[in-house]
């Protein structure tokens, strides 16, 4: 019996060690209405991209779609004399460093005016940490929230070292 408990404990510890090192972010709303997934996908031998997908009640409503930003850093990088290989989309070749799942949120707040005196705010949240491995040290976080009413995500650029 002690052996079984010890093995179960070891497996739990091992799983928790690798939980933050997944290359995929998969999040479901509190009631399971919406599901969103972000992952890294290799599209050629030299290019990978971040794609996302959204499901509503188990049905796919947004198929694999490319997450992207149109940024033109060439002038800045030339001024800094950086030798960086330019890619078609700024988000190409971002590598997933880790995915961190935040504790579920379930709280209420009171608006100053409106139809309701109390508004419930319930969601699950995760953050995907990405970085460029081309010598630029650029980083990007994708912060994702899954509400029962819908999905929200934003791009966050941490301060550049």
Label each PLM-derived region with a short phrase.
Residues 4-13:
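Sec-dependent N-terminal signal peptides
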Residues 17-22:
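Boundary at the C-terminal end of the N-terminal hydrophobic targeting segment
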Residues 24-161:
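N-terminal accessory beta-strand-rich subdomains and adjacent acidic, glycine-rich linkers
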């Amino acid at each position: 019996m002690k052996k079984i408990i010890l093995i179960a404990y070891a497996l739990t510890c091992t799983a928790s060690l690798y939980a933050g090192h997944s290359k995929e972010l998969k999040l479901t709303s509190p009631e399971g209405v919406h599901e969103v997934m972000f992952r890294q996908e290799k599209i050629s031998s030299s290019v990978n991209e971040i794609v996302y997908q959204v499901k509503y009640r188990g049905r796919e409503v947004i198929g694999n779609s490319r997450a992207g930003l149109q940024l033109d850093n060439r002038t800045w990088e030339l001024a800094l004399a950086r030798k960086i290989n330019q890619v078609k989309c700024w988000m190409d070749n971002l590598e997933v460093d880790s995915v961190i799942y935040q504790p579920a949120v379930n709280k209420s707040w009171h608006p100053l005016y409106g139809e309701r005196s109390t508004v419930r705010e319930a969601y699950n949240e995760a953050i995907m940490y990405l970085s460029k491995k081309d010598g630029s040290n650029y980083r990007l976080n994708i912060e994702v929230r899954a509400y029962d009413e819908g999905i929200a995500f934003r791009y966050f650029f941490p301060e550049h070292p």
